[in-house]
Amino acid sequence: MKLDEVTISRAIIEEFSKVFLDYTDVDVALVGGGPANLVAAKYLAEAGLKTVIYEKKLAVGGGMWAGGMMFPRIVVQEDALHILDEFGISYHEYENGYYVANSIESVGKLISGATSAGAEIFNLVNVEDVMIRENDEICGLVINWTAVEIGKLHVDPLAIRSKVVVDGTGHPAVVCSTVQRKVPGAKLGELGVVGEKPMWADVGEKMLLDTTKEVYPNLYVAGMAANAVAGAPRMGPVFGGMLLSGKQVAELIIERLG
C-alpha cells in the first residue's frame, strides 16, 4: 500500500474530533489522570456511565510512574490487593502487610483498565474553571489546551457539560481551589480547602477514605486531592489508599447516578 500523508492527517483529525465532540456532554468528568481517577474511571465506565478524564500533562499516571524518589516501585497494603488483581497488576509480599509492585507496570495497566472499560482520556487539556448554574451548582468544566497556558496565549476556552466532577488533581486540588476562590461564600467541607499536612503515611492512608466524598454540589474529591482539601497528611509512595479512594468515589457516584 502506498501511504498518503494527507489521508493520515485527515484520519487523525476526523476521528479525534468525533470523539472530542461526543464527550462535550458526559455523566462524569474526572480532572487529573492519576491512579485514583484511573481506578474510578474503570468502575464508572463499567457501570455504564459516560466517563472522561482530562489530564493536563502529556502522560497520565500522576506521581505513580517514578515510584519513590525515581525507584520505580510502589508499596500497596493488603486491603487494596483486590484492585491490583482486578487490573491484572503483579505484586509480591515484601514483609507482612507490605506488598510491592512495579510502578511502570501499574500505571500501564491502570490506563489499560480504564480505557478498555470504555472511559475516554484526553491528555494535554487544562481545566481552568468550572461551569455553574442556579445556586452556583457545578454543571461542567471550562477547558483549554495546556499549550495555551504554557504559552500564556490569550485564547478563550471551551466548555463541557457533566453531571458530576471529580477533582483528582493531587496536592494542589486545582478544581476545589478554583471553586473556593471564584464562588462567593463557597465552603468545601468544614473548613474549606485547608491544604495537606506533612507526611504521616499511616494516618494519611487511614483518613483518605473519610476525605473521599462530595465536598460541594456535584463536586467530589479523590486521591491526594481529598486529603489536601481536608488538611490530612500526605502519604508518599504507598498507593493502597489512592486505589481504594478511586474505587470509593466511583461507588458513591454510581449509587447516585446509576
From Swiss-Prot:
It catalyses: hydrogen sulfide + glycine + NAD(+) = ADP-5-ethyl-4-methylthiazole-2-carboxylate + nicotinamide + 3 H2O + H(+). One of its GO terms (molecular function) is pentosyltransferase activity. Glycine binds at R234. Its cofactor is Fe(2+). InterPro entries: FAD/NAD-bd_sf, Thi4_fam, Thi4_prok. Keywords: Iron, Metal-binding, NAD, Thiamine biosynthesis, Transferase. Pathway: Cofactor biosynthesis; thiamine diphosphate biosynthesis. NAD(+) binds at A36, E55, K56, G63, V127, H154, V155, D156, M224. The keyword Transferase applies. GO terms for biological process: thiamine biosynthetic process; thiamine diphosphate biosynthetic process; thiazole biosynthetic process. Fe cation binds at D156, H171. Gene3D superfamilies: FAD/NAD(P)-binding domain. Signal peptide: none annotated. Its EC number is 2.4.2.59. Belongs to the THI4 family. Involved in the biosynthesis of the thiazole moiety of thiamine. Catalyzes the conversion of NAD and glycine to adenosine diphosphate 5-(2-hydroxyethyl)-4-methylthiazole-2-carboxylate (ADT), an adenylated thiazole intermediate, using free sulfide as a source of sulfur. NCBIfam families: sulfide-dependent adenosine diphosphate thiazole synthase (TIGR00292). Homooctamer; tetramer of dimers. This is Thiamine thiazole synthase. The lineage of its organism: Archaea, Methanobacteriati, Methanobacteriota, Stenosarchaea group, Methanomicrobia.
